[in-house]
UniProtKB/Swiss-Prot annotation:
Disulfide bonds: none annotated. The keyword Nucleotide-binding applies. GO terms for molecular function: ATP binding; ATP-dependent DNA damage sensor activity; damaged DNA binding; mismatched DNA binding. Residues 131-274 are annotated as: A2. ATP binds at residues 591-598. SMART domains: MUTSac, MUTSd. GO terms for biological process: mismatch repair. The keyword DNA repair applies. This is DNA mismatch repair protein MutS. It comes from the Bacteria. The lineage of its organism: Bacteria, Thermotogati, Deinococcota, Deinococci, Thermales. Optimum temperature is 80 degrees Celsius for ATPase activity.
Length: 819
C-alpha cells in the first residue's frame, strides 16, 4: 500500500501517491517489518538507504539531507549513508540508542534476474557487537537481571565469550555490580519491566539501552540466575543469527573480593571523573594491548583479599621494575599484538576476515620473540604450526573481503596455481593481440582496451578508419575513434570470465579451509591472550611505578605510609607528600576548607586499593593491612531528581558503612553531618565516630566539628592540615601534622573566595562576638558548678540545673532547654 499520516504500520510506508509500492520499496517494507524494533539499513548500490519515517529518523539523528525516492505512482522520504563510511555512522547510531538491521545485496546486480536479492546479514545492538571497528577497547557487556530467590545478575561479552553471573541479596548490591561492570545493554525480566517505579529509577541511574528477551531458565544454580542466563543466550543468539561462541558460565561471589560500593568507586574516581578527565584507571593504563586494558579494569573492579596471590602479582611487577631492558622489550612487542581474545571469537563464529588472519599471523610472529625475552616459563602455547600455515598461504597485505580476490599466495594451492596460469595465458593472448593486429592491419595507433560494458575491444583512431578489416565488428563510436571486436576475442573473453569465477571460488575454498585450521586453535589463542594480557598489566604497572616513583607495599596489621601521594592529583600539580600511621584507630582530620583534607583521605584509600590489585604505590614506604572493604562518604552527591537531598544521600551512604564495615575495613568520612543544623550535625557525627571506634575500623574522619577532637575515646587520634595566616592572607601548606587544628579559618577562606570586603569584616565581627559570648558562658558554667552543693539537690532540681548549664554553654536563653 501507499502512504499514510500516522504511526509506522506493518506493510505500509510513509509517502505520497496512489501506489502500489514499486518492487524495491516492497522488498524494503517486507524486511523492515521482520525487525520492527530495528532501524533497517538497506543496501542500494554503494549506499545503505532508509525510506519513509525511518529515513526521517536517520536524517534527524545524523544531520543528513532528506531527499525523496520517486517512482511512477509513489514518492517517499529517503536518506542514506555511504557503505565506505558505515562503521563511523553505525557507531554514532548505536551510541544514540538505535538497534540496527543491515540488509545487504547477496547477489551481484549483473547476475540478478529482476530485483537484486537482499537479506539482513547483521543485527547490531550496543551489547552484542563482535565487529572490531564498532567495539570499545573495554569489555562490552550485555547484562540480564531477574528476580526469584534473590537478584539474579548475569553478564555476557559476545565479543570475547566471557559469561558470568552472581546472585545478590539486595537492590543496592545489584546497583553496585552494575556500576562496577557498566554494561552497554541490559535485559530486564518481565516482572521488572512491568514495575514502572523500578524502571524509572533504573533508567535514571543507568542510562543504557533496555531490551527484551525470553527469560527461560538455563544452566544450573538458583532460579533467578538461571533465568538471567537463559535471557542472555536467547538474545545473543537472536542477534547473531544463531551462531554464538560462549565460554562456560562462571559463578562469581562479590564477597570474595574487596568490597567497593558504588559510592567508593565514584568518590575515588576509579573509572569516572567527578570533574575534569582524570581517573585512577587513566593514570594506571599504560597497557599495550586491548586484553591487557580489559584485565586491568577487571583487577580494579575486584581487588584481592588474599596475601598469596597479591605477593605473586607484586613479584612479577617487581621483576619488570628491576629489569628495565626486559620491560621495554616486552612492551615494544606487545604493542604489535592484535586483540587475540576477540579474534578467537570471530574465528569460532566464522566471521574472521582475510585481514583478521593477517593480523593473527603478525601476532603469532611475536610469540617466539617474547619467549626469547622471558624464557619458556612464560607458558605460551605452541602455535608455530598455524603460523607456518598462515605464512605460506596469505599474501602480505590481503584485502578486507574474500570476494575482492588476490589473498592466497602463489605456490600454496596447486589447483589455484593452475587456474591462475590458465588465466595469465588468456590475458597474454590480448597483450599479444595488439602487436599482431598492428602488424597485420598496418594501423600504428591500434590499441587493445577493456571496459566493464563492452569487455575487451580494439580501438582505431579516425585517420585509419579506411584500414579497418571487414571482420572487425563495431561496438562503440566516439568523437575521434571507434572500438571493435572480433569473434575470437569474445570466445577468449568468455573463457577469461569463467577462469576468474573459478579462481574466486577456489580462493574462497582455500580461505575457508585456512580459517577452519585457525578456528581449531581458538582455545590456544585465548590462552595466549590471557597470558599476554597478564604480562601487559605487570609491565604497565611497572612502567607507572618507575616513571612516577612508586614503591612496593608490604602487608601487615598496621597502616603505615611514609611520604604518600595522591596518584591522580600529583599528575596535575605539585604535590606535598604526607605520612600516616594507624592501627584500628579513629583518626580525626581537621583544618580549613581547601587545605587538602579530602585529598589526604582519598590518597590513603587509593594507596590501599592499588596495593590490593598487586600494584606498587605512590609513597616512599607503605605497610598496609589487607582490607576487606573500602567505604567512603566524601563530597556532596545529592539526588534532587529522585527527591533526595544531600543530607539524605549522605545518611544512606553512612548507613551502608555502619551495616557492612568490619574491623578489617577502611572507612573514609568527609564532613558528615554538614547537611543539617549544627546541633544535629555534631550529634550525628559524634554518634558515628563512637560507633566506628567501637567497631575498630580503620577510620579517617575529616570534620569541621571541633567538638569531636575532645571525645574521650582511647583509640582516637587527631591530625590537622597545616595552614597559617600571613601578611598576604591564608597560606595552605598541605601538610598533615599531629593534633587538632587551632581554628577553621572559615572567614579567611571566604575572603579568598572573593566575598565583598564589607561582608568579610561583618563576619569577623560577628565571629569575635560569638566567641566572646561563648567564653563568658563557659566561665559562668564553671562558676555555677563550683558553687553547687550536689548533696542538697533533689532529682528534679538536678535535671533543671543541667538544662540551664547546657543553655548557657550554647548561648541560649535560660529555660529554653526545658520540657
Amino acid at each position: 500500500m501507499g502512504g499514510y499520516g500516522g504511526v509506522k504500520m506493518e506493510g505500509m510506508l510513509k509517502g505520497e501517491g496512489p501506489g502500489p509500492l514499486p518492487p524495491l520499496l516492497q522488498q524494503y517494507v517486507e524486511l523492515r517489518d521482520r525487525y520492527p524494533d530495528y532501524l533497517l539499513l538497506f543496501q542500494v548500490g554503494d549506499f545503505y538507504e532508509c525510506f519513509g519515517e525511518d529515513a526521517e529518523r536517520l536524517a534527524r539523528a545524523l544531520g543528513l539531507v532528506l531527499t525523496h525516492k520517486t517512482s511512477k505512482d509513489f514518492t517517499t522520504p529517503m536518506a542514506g549513508i555511504p557503505i565506505r563510511a558505515f562503521d563511523a555512522y553505525a557507531e554514532r547510531l548505536l551510541k544514540m540508542g538505535f538497534r540496527l538491521a543491515v540488509a545487504d545485496q547477496v547477489e551481484p546486480a549483473e547476475e540478478a534476474e529482476g530485483l537484486v536479492r537482499r537479506e539482513v546479514t547483521q543485527l547490531l545492538t550496543p551489547g552484542t557487537l563482535t565487529q572490531e571497528a564498532l567495539l570499545p577497547r573495554e569489555a562490552n557487556y550485555l547484562a540480564a537481571i531477574a528476580t526469584g530467590d534473590g537478584w539474579g545478575l548475569a553478564f555476557l561479552d559476545v565479543s570475547t565469550g566471557e559469561f558470568k553471573g552472581t546472585l545478590l541479596k539486595s537492590k543496592s548490591a545489584l546497583y553496585d555490580e552494575l556500576f562496577r561492570h557498566r554494561p552497554a545493554e541490559v535485559l530486564l525480566a518481565p516482572e521488572l519491566r512491568e514495575n514502572e517505579a523500578f524502571v524509572a529509577e533504573f533508567r535514571k541511574r543507568f542510562p543504557v539501552m533496555l531490551s527484551e528477551a525470553p527469560f527461560e531458565p538455563q544452566g544450573e544454580g538458583p532460579l533467578a540466575l538461571r533465568r538471567a542466563q537463559g535471557a542472555l543466550l536467547a538474545y545473543a543468539r537472536a542477534t547473531q543469527g544463531g551462531a554464538l561462541s560462549v565460554r562456560p558460565f562462571r559463578l562469581y561471589d562479590p564477597g570474595a573480593f574487596v568490597r567497593l560500593p558504588e559510592a567508593s568507586l565514584k568518590a575515588l574516581e576509579v573509572f569516572e571523573p567527578l570533574r575534569g578527565q582524570d581517573t585512577l584507571f587513566g593514570v594506571l593504563d599504560e597497557t599495550r594491548t586491548a586484553p591487557g586494558r580489559r584485565l586491568l579494569q577487571a583487577w580494579l573492579r575486584h581487588p584481592l583479599l588474599e596475601r598469596g596471590p597479591l605477593e605473586a602479582r607484586l613479584d612479577r611487577v617487581e621483576r619488570f621494575v628491576r629489569e628495565g631492558a626486559l620491560r621495554e622489550g616486552v612492551r615494544r612487542l606487545l604493542f604489535r599484538l592484535a586483540d587475540l581474545e576477540r579474534l578467537a571469537t570471530r574465528l569460532e563464529l566464522s566471521r574472521a576476515s582475510p585481514r583478521d588472519l593477517a593480523a593473527l599471523r603478525r601476532s603469532l610472529e611475536i610469540l617466539p620473540e617474547l619467549k626469547g625475552l622471558l624464557g619458556e616459563e612464560v607458558g605460551l602455547p605452541d602455535l608455530s604450526g598455524l603460523l607456518e600455515e598462515l605464512r605460506a598461504a596469505l599474501v602480505e597485505d590481503p584485502p578486507l573481503k574474500v570476494s575482492e580476490g588476490g589473498l592466497i599466495r602463489e605456490g600454496y594451492d596447486p589447483d589455484l596455481d593452475a587456474l591462475r596460469r590458465a588465466h595469465a595465458e588468456g590475458v597474454a593472448y590480448f597483450l599479444d593481440l595488439e602487436a599482431r593486429e598492428k602488424e597485420r592491419t598496418g594501423i600504428p595507433t591500434l590499441k587493445v582496451g577493456y571496459n566493464a560494458v563492452f569487455g575487451y575491444y580494439l580501438e582505431v583512431t579516425r585517420p585509419y578508419y579506411e584500414k579497418v578489416p571487414q571482420e572487425y565488428r563495431p561496438v562503440q563510436t566516439l568523437k575521434d575513434r571507434q572500438r571493435y571486436t572480433l569473434p575470437e576475442m569474445k570466445e577468449r573473453e568468455r573463457e577469461l570470465y569463467r577462469l576468474e569465477a573459478l579462481i574466486k571460488r577456489r580462493e574462497e575454498e582455500v580461505f575457508l579451509a585456512l580459517r577452519e585450521r585457525a578456528r581449531k586453535e581458538a582455545e590456544a589463542l585465548r590462552e595466549a591472550a590471557r597470558i599476554l594480557a597478564e604480562l601487559d598489566v605487570y609491565a604497565a604497572l611497572a612502567e607507572v611505578a618507575v616513571r612516577h616513583g612508586y614503591t612496593r607495599p608490604r602487608f601487615g596489621e598496621r597502616l603505615r605510609i611514609r611520604a604518600g601521594r595522591h596518584p591522580v592529583v600529583e599528575r596535575r600539580t605539585a604535590f606535598v607528600p604526607n605520612d600516616l600511621e594507624m592501627a584500628h584507630e579513629l583518626v580525626l582530620v581537621t583544618g580549613p576548607n581547601m587545605a587538602g583534607k579530602s585529598t589526604f583521605l582519598r590518597q590513603t584509600a587509593l594507596i590501599a586499593l592499588l596495593a590490593q590489585i598487586g600494584s606498587f604505590v605512590p609513597a616512599e614506604e607503605a605497610e598496609l593491612p589487607l582490607f576487606d572493604g573500602i567505604y567512603t562518604r566524601i563530597g556532596a552527591s545529592d539526588d534532587l531528581a529522585g527527591g533526595k537531598s544531600t543530607f539524605m544521600v549522605e545518611m544512606e551512604e553512612v548507613a551502608l558503612v555502619l551495616k557492612e564495615a568490619t574491623e578489617r575495613s577502611l572507612v573514609l568520612l568527609d564532613e558528615v553531618g554538614r547537611g543539617t543544623s549544627s546541633l544535629d550535625g555534631v550529634a550525628i557525627a559524634t554518634a558515628l565516630a563512637e560507633a566506628l571506634h567501637e567497631r575498630r575500623c580503620y577510620t579517617l574522619f575529616a570534620t569541621h566539628y571541633f567538638e569531636l577532637t575532645a571525645l574521650a575515646l582511647p583509640r582516637l587520634k587527631n591530625l590537622h592540615v597545616a595552614a597559617k595566616e600571613e601578611e598576604g592572607g591564608l597560606v595552605f601548606y598541605h601538610q598533615v601534622l599531629p593534633g587538632p587544628a587551632s581554628k577553621s579559618y572559615g572567614v579567611e577562606v571566604a575572603e579568598m573566595a572573593g566575598l565583598p570586603k564589607e561582608v568579610v569584616e561583618r563576619a569577623r565581627a560577628l565571629l569575635s562576638a560569638m566567641a566572646a559570648r561563648r567564653e563568658g558562658a563557659l566561665e559562668e558554667v564553671l562558676e555555677r558548678l563550683l558553687a553547687l552543693d550536689p548533696d542538697r539537690l533533689t532529682p528534679l532540681e538536678a535535671l533543671r540545673f543541667l538544662h540551664e548549664l547546657k543553655a548557657l554553654a550554647l548561648g541560649l536563653p535560660l529555660g529554653s532547654m526545658k520540657g
